[in-house]
Every structure is written in C-alpha cells, then in structure tokens.
Amino acid sequence: MKRTKVFYNVLILLAALLLTACQDQKDIPEVSSTEKNLVLSDHISNQKVMSICEDKYGQIWIGTFRGLNKYDGNQYHQYYCVDDSLGLPDNHITDIYRDSHNRLWVATVYGVCLYQANGNFNRVSINGSNKNIEKILEDKEGRIFFLTMTDLYQYDENTNTAIIKLSKMVEKNCYNYSCHIDRKDVMWIVTSYSVKGYRTQDLKLIVQCPVQSHPIASFLLDGHQLYISGYNGMQLFDTDTRKWGGSSCSIARLANPQRHGQLHPSVWRKRQPSA
C-alpha cells in the first residue's frame, strides 16, 4: 500500500513537470528553417514602438526598441540583427518608410537597409561617422534622404551608398528637431531655435526663420501648412508664402480631422504612396 502511494505521488509529480514543460515550450517562438534572422511569434518583439508602416501588400511593419516586426494579420514575423551582412544593421529600429517604388526602408541606430522579397536586408553603405539614422524622407523626384542629428545623407542608387550632403544643420544645445519635405520639394528642418528650408534639388539653404516657444513637435499638413507646437502653444508656418500665421479653421481641421477627411497628427506620421 505504501509503495502504491509513493508510485502515485511520483506519477503526479511527473505529470506536473510535463505540463510545465509544455507551457514553457508554447511561449518559445518558432524559428523559421529558411531564415535565420526570422522568428515567428504571437507577440510583438518589444513594447516600445518607434515606427509603423504599411507595405504594398497591406502588411503592417512595426519597428521597436528591440527588433523589427511584420504583422500579417495572424502572427508577427520578427527580424533581428544577426552576425550576417544580410540582416538588420541593429535591433533598435528608428524609422520605417515605404517609398514611391514600394520599396521598404528600415532605419536603425547603426545604419539603414532595404528589405528584400526573399526576407533579407540590403544594407546601405554610409560614408560618414554618424550612422544613427533618425528619419527617412523622399521628394517628388524620388530622391531618398537619411537624417541624423548631425548630418543629412542622400542615397546614391548606383553605388548603394549614403553620401553626406549637409552637416551641422542643427544648432548647438539643440536636442529636439524634426524634418519634412513640402509639395514644392523644399526640405524644412525645425529645431528649437529656427525653421530652415533647403531646396532638395541642390540642398541649398533658401529660407531661415527664428521660432518661438522652443518647438517639441511639428506636422506638415496638405504639403504646405507646417504646424509647430511647443510649451506655450502652436505656431503655423506656410511653406508656400513663407509667412507665419494661422486661422481658427486650420486649427479646427486638426481638432476635428474626420470632418475634413484627415487623420489626426498623433496617428498620421507620414503619408504613404498608394500600392
């Protein structure tokens, strides 16, 4: 009788261990056999989301503090930096952008790359020391630009290289800035102290205006209305007339975007070209 009781206790213990092992195994993402840098999971790789973009197939790409995620409607395809030149340059994603040719660009704190149809990444060679790409932009002519805190790079299709075109665009002691390209292909860099306009054709500085209230965020609406917000309110700069101004109607469009067919700035980071 005593042996039987011990036997049953051992069976119960083994069953409990087996259930625990199965539960732990369920939480381990499945590794694809075809792509070493791809992990399949029911969860996003990291909760700190840095950028979101939709590709031409309607799949949602999410860049996080640790890893790149592609959500296909059922599960997350997670991409990581691996010891391979065909992988991501770094796990810390800063920006994702779909250009006019439906190519998907991924920027990281240590470089930028193009996603390939086979699941690999084509890394762009950078001829500068600062590889922390914070934003990817494109003008109407299809020119691709990469912005860092210190430099502006332009992509050379022939050599797959990012070439420095501008340096020291941001003033000293400025740790917050933003950048937009308007409908006339002028690149506007908003810093804590000024708004600067560069013609994308030759990146010549054509406009520089001081700003107030130390801007912390900006948003380009309709290709020419540059809204700049700071601690003391909001300013409106028209990039067509290059004058400061504002109207209750314009502010109303931001406050109630559904009535005007617009997305709110907090959820519309950039317009993406149609598929």
Map each language-model feature to its residues.
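Carboxylate-rich, polar loop motifs that coordinate divalent cations or form catalytic acidic clusters
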Residues: K2-A275
